[in-house]
UniProtKB/Swiss-Prot annotation:
Involved in starvation response and aggregation stage of the life cycle. May be involved in fruiting body morphogenesis and spore formation. It is a single-pass membrane protein. GO terms for cellular component: plasma membrane. This is Starvation responsive small protein A. Signal peptide: none annotated. It comes from Dictyostelium discoideum (Social amoeba).
Amino acid sequence: MIAKVFKSITPESYILLVNAGLISAYGVRIIFQSVKNDEGKVDEKAHIGIGHFFKKRGAQLVDGKNLTDILKEKKKKKKKKKKINISNKLIIFKISRQLYSKLKLK
C-alpha cells in the first residue's frame, strides 16, 4: 500500500512537499524564536518580515527620494571604515623589516 502511494507521487508533488516542509520549518523557527524572546531566555533580534523592508523603501520614495539617492546613502554609511594610506603601510613595513634584521643579527 505504501509502495502504491510512493509510485503515485509525481516529481512535481515531491517539489511541493519539500517546499511546504521548508516553509513550515521556517515558520516553526520564527514562532520558537518569538516565544523564547517573550520568555526572556534568548536575547535575539526580533523577526522583521520582508514586508517591512518594502514599506520602508516605499515611504522613502513617497518622501521624494529616488532609488539612486537611497543607494548612495547606504554606500556613504558603509564607507566610514578607517583606511590606512599606502605611505603608512610602507613605513610600517620598513620599521618591521628593521626590527627583524636587528633581531636576526643578535
